[in-house]
Structures are given as structure tokens and as C-alpha cells.
């Protein structure tokens, strides 16, 4: 052991130990912290999504209430040829524009989310939905507090209804960072009944690996949904007064209609059964000729999300919406299950998907985050390899020092 240099050995042990500590910090502590900060839903962010549907069918509320704004005069919307008098329905392209913004709250780990959705037919706004809720920034799940609100507006009817504060559950506009291959609970923005959002399979969207998720929202009464939310915050006396209302009055209350508008809406929701049902459907639902029916709106949808799993970014979103008239819940389910689609009973039907600009914008959001994750993984790998190498060197230096000391002890004993 004549070549042993104690000072050099000590310096090597010190340097190796420092490299090990730094390697552990860089390889195992700093990346998780960086990823945690990346996964936090940012405050002050805005997402603009534009959906398009090449073919849609919509109840022509303008012609019913305000002929001066009838989009049937536009080249993009034409009247549907139906056995009913007048231009009761339109067909043509439809647009769905959504803007989602986030803002800070008094809690660092929570963020406010505000969304505005607008359905546009023939250049005219047909429906708007504004909603506000609060999310946990690290999971993108709603907080368990009654802070969520909604406002539905139907411009052709000059009506709007505000849904009082309630507790939102399930995913809605954002997916968790590091999305898993499993089912999630999904809260549709139109009706707030939770439905399963099931993982389907891995796919590729614009060259990027993605997970495909699918949710089906069964037929739900829009009137019942709105009244349920309203009654959930009302006093017992208010609940009793709502229960005493006639179906027409409940319809008027749910949509916030004035008396004149309510009378106009009755023209497309009440009448003899043969006006709304084909002869085969009359037989299916056991209607007699001339039997009066009173219909209400039902909503159903299928949603398909394509999610980049590492960042939770929605790369594409398809939604098939069908809002139609039915007399009751049982009939609505039968219409859906047996595919008894009749344009006369259609309120709104469209198959929406992100347009190319929105897909590109979402890809531009995901790409730099994916690059940062890959860089962190590479840094972590290099740091861990360096740590292992430094540990090997440290062990070798410690063994050499121990052997040197053992040799010195033997020499002293022999002397």
C-alpha cells in the first residue's frame, strides 16, 4: 500500500460524497418537485375551443318569435322539408364556441374556472351556457363546496335561467396530469348527473399518442334538471309551490319565460299526437287520433375525448348532441334506445368536433410540456447513473482507506 495517498483519498471521498448528494437531489428530489409544479392548473390561463358540425337540425325559434332574425334567410341555414306548415326547423352547419379562463382564489391550491359556451346557427346565437366552479389545482377535480353556478340563456326566447350554487362532482373541462387508463366520473356541462367516462384504447392524434375516453349521457329532462337544482336551494314552502305548478307553468318557470313567449313555445310543445308522431310511432306509444299531448325537452349526448396522457391535455373532443321533445321519461328512453328520431320533435341535433385550429392549439399546449417531461426524465436518468458511479467510487475509496489502516496496524504490531 506504498502508493496510498491519504490526502488524495480523503479528497476523493469528500468529492464522491458531494456528487452522491447532488445526484440524489437532481435525480430523485428535484424532478418530482418540478413535475408537481407543472401539474398545477395555471391561474390566469385562457383556452379557446371552436367546435364545428357540418350538419345540424334545429327548431326554428326565430321564425316562431322573431321573424326578423330568422337565419333561414342566410345561405348557411335552410328550412327542413316537413309536413308541418311554415319553416319550423332549420338545417345546416352549426358552431360551438367555448372560452375557459382560470383565476386565482384565496387558496394557493385552488383555482376559479369560468366557461362561456355559445351555440351559433346561421350566424345567430341560439343558446349560451355560462358556468363557474372551483378546482383543486393538483388534481383538476372540483372542490367539495357549493360554489358552482350556471346560467342558461336562450337568445331567441329572450330567456335565461340561473342555477343556484351547488357542489360540482367529477371531471368536466380538464383531465388530471398523468391521466390513467381507467374510468372517471364525468359531469356534463348541460345536465349535472354524473356518468362514467370510460377508457377505450390508445390512439394517435396528429402524431401524438393519446388515450381515448367515451361517455354517454342518457336522455335527461332539461326541465327536471333545472327545477331540481332550483329546488335544491329553495325553502320547503318554495318546493311545495313548485310541486303545485302545472307542467306548463313548470316549463315556464324552468326557462324563465314571460307569458307571451310561453304562449309561443306552447305552439310547438302541445297539440294532437299526430302532429308530433308518425303513424308507426302513434301505434308504438298507443296514441289515439286527436289525443292531446304535452311535450318537454330532453337532452342526451355522447362525448369522446382524446387526451395526451402525460399532461392531461385534451387534443380532440367529439360530442354528439340530441335535444328532442318527448312526453315523459319512459318515452324519452324508448325514443333513444329504439332510435325513433323524428325531425318534427327535434330541438337541436348536431355532431360537433374540434376544428383544425383548436386541435393545433391544443397540440401546441401539450408539446412543450411533453418536451419538459422528457428532459426531466433524461436529467433524472443521467443524475441517477452518476450517483451510482459516485457510490461505486466512494465505496472503493473507503475500502482502500480501511485496508491501508489495517496494514498500518499490522506493521505497528510487528514493530
Place the predicted regions along the sequence by residue.
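Hydrophobic transmembrane signal anchors and adjacent membrane-proximal interface regions, especially
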Residues: 49, 59, 295-299, 408-410
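Membrane-proximal low-complexity regions enriched in glycine and acidic/polar residues
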Residues: 184-323
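Juxtamembrane interface at the cytosolic side of transmembrane helices
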Residues: 3-18, 30-31, 371-415
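Solvent-exposed N-terminal domain segments of exported/luminal and surface proteins
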Residues: 2-160
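Short N-terminal edge-element motif at the start of the domain
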Residues: 156-192
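Membrane-proximal extracellular "stem/stalk" segments
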Residues: 278-380, 384, 391
Amino acid at each position: 500500500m506504498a502508493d496510498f495517498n491519504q490526502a488524495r483519498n480523503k479528497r476523493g471521498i469528500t468529492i464522491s460524497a458531494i456528487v452522491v448528494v447532488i445526484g440524489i437531489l437532481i435525480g430523485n428530489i428535484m424532478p418530482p418537485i418540478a413535475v408537481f409544479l407543472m401539474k398545477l392548473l395555471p391561474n390566469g390561463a385562457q383556452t379557446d375551443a371552436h367546435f364545428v358540425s357540418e350538419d345540424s337540425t334545429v327548431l326554428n325559434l326565430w321564425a316562431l318569435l322573431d321573424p326578423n332574425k330568422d337565419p333561414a334567410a342566410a345561405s348557411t341555414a335552410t328550412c327542413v322539408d316537413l309536413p308541418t306548415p311554415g319553416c319550423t326547423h332549420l338545417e345546416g352547419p352549426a358552431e360551438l364556441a367555448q372560452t375557459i379562463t382560470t383565476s386565482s382564489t384565496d387558496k394557493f391550491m385552488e383555482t376559479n374556472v369560468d366557461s362561456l359556451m355559445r351555440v351559433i346557427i346561421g350566424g345567430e346565437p341560439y343558446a349560451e351556457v355560462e358556468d363557474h366552479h372551483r378546482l383543486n389545482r393538483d388534481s383538476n377535480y372540483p372542490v367539495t363546496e357549493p360554489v358552482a353556478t350556471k346560467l342558461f340563456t336562450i337568445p331567441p326566447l329572450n330567456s335565461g335561467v340561473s342555477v343556484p350554487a351547488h357542489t360540482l362532482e367529477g371531471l368536466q373541462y380538464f383531465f388530471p396530469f398523468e391521466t390513467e387508463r381507467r374510468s372517471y366520473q364525468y359531469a356534463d356541462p348541460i345536465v349535472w348527473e354524473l356518468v362514467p367516462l370510460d377508457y377505450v384504447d390508445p390512439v394517435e392524434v396528429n402524431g401524438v399518442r393519446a388515450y381515448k375516453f367515451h361517455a354517454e349521457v342518457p336522455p335527461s329532462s332539461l326541465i327536471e334538471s333545472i327545477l331540481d337544482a332550483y329546488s335544491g336551494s329553495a325553502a320547503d314552502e318554495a318546493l311545495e309551490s313548485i310541486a303545485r305548478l302545472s307542467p306548463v307553468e313548470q316549463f315556464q318557470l324552468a326557462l324563465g319565460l314571460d307569458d307571451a313567449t310561453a304562449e309561443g313555445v306552447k305552439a310547438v310543445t302541445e297539440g294532437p299526437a299526430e302532429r308530433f308522431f308518425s303513424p308507426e310511432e302513434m301505434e308504438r306509444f298507443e296514441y289515439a287520433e286527436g289525443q292531446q299531448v304535452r311535450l318537454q325537452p330532453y337532452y342526451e349526448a355522447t362525448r369522446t375525448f382524446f387526451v395526451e396522457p402525460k399532461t392531461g391535455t385534451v387534443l380532440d373532443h367529439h360530442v354528439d348532441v340530441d335535444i328532442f321533445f318527448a312526453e315523459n321519461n319512459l318515452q324519452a328512453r324508448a325514443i333513444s334506445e329504439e332510435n325513433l328520431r323524428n325531425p318534427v320533435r327535434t330541438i337541436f341535433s348536431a355532431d360537433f368536433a374540434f376544428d383544425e385550429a383548436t386541435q393545433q392549439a391544443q397540440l401546441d399546449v401539450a408539446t412543450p410540456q411533453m418536451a419538459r417531461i422528457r428532459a426531466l426524465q433524461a436529467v433524472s436518468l443521467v443524475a441517477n447513473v452518476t450517483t451510482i458511479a459516485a457510490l461505486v467510487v466512494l465505496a472503493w475509496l473507503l475500502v482502500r482507506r480501511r485496508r491501508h489502516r489495517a496494514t498500518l496496524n499490522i506493521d505497528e504490531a510487528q514493530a
